[in-house]
Structures are given as structure tokens and as C-alpha cells.
Amino acid sequence: MVIWITGLSGSGKTTLAVALHDLLKPNCKHAVLLDGDVIRAAFGAGLGYSEPERVIQIQRIQNFAKVLADQELIVIVAALYAHKDLLSWNRANLPGYFEVYLDASMALLEGRDQKNLYSKARSGETSDVVGFDIPWHTPDNPDMQINADAEADPIVVARQLIDIVPTLSGFLA
């Protein structure tokens, strides 16, 4: 099964993915976390942040997630770029696919802007920022949509996710 968590930078994707993984870990040794930033650091040498390069990055994560899920691992993905064609591919090809969309206001995102992406994009210091010069594609039909502005506790959201996904409910510590 693949749980795909998406949202803009700063929406809480990695935080939620880590919380979910940590809740499952004590009773589920076959849960794997794939974070987009970690995958890029490990396998993305020479890959930039333009829209075509972001597609390549997501396709790498998709392929990796499929290989792991085909071996009956529970794969938790935290990945930013959510182009509709890529999400459609996920739904058609990833076993047990469950999509989570973290919807966050720009005020929240800019408040959490650890990478200074949004401030640099506003000032013109950088380009290729999703939500500024690269369009953000809001997922059409996520299995779970979370208002990141309203729900601050990732453990609470991770527990809700476990309750919703029948495959996960037996693994809660």
C-alpha cells in the first residue's frame, strides 16, 4: 500500500509522514518512509527545480514506491509536486493507493518557511517555486484532505489517518 501525502512546501507533509511512521513502527516493521527532500538528496544529483525536473523527481519517487509496495511494504510518501497526471498515475499503478492533501494558507506556509523559499520568490531572488512561478495543482479527489491551518497536531492527524485506512488499523501501538 502507498500513502501519498502532498501539499505545498511548509504544509506539514514530512511532519505528518514522520508522525504516521512513528505510530506504525512499533507494530509494523514493514513501513517505509520516502520523503521527497531525502530522495532528492540521495538520487537527484544534477536535478534542478524547474517544472520538468520536478516531474522527473516525482517519477523517481513513484517508481521507488511501486517497487516497495509490490513487495508488500507499507510506503508513506511525502512529496510536494502534485500535477494531476502524476496523481492519476499513482491511483492507477500504486497498490492500495491513498492520497492525503494538506491544504494550507499562504500565511501559514510563509510562517513555516524554513527554507526561505517564499520570501526569496517574492523578492525575485529565486525562481522555480511551486505556488509562485510554477503552478500548484490542487488534487482533484484526495482520499483525505486536511486543513493544515486548523489542525496543528500531526499525531492527531496520523491517528485519524490510521483510523480511516483499514490496512493500517491493526498496527497502531
List each language-model region with its residue ranges.
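Walker A (P-loop) ATP-phosphate-binding motif of ABC ATPase nucleotide-binding domains
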Residues: 2
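Hydrophobic anchor at the beta1->P-loop junction of P-loop NTPases
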Residues: 5
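P-loop (Walker A) phosphate-binding loop of NTP-binding proteins
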Residues: 8
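Walker A/P-loop
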Residues: 14
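Small-molecule kinase domains that catalyze NTP-dependent phosphoryl transfer to phosphate-bearing small molecules
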Residues: 111-159, 165-173
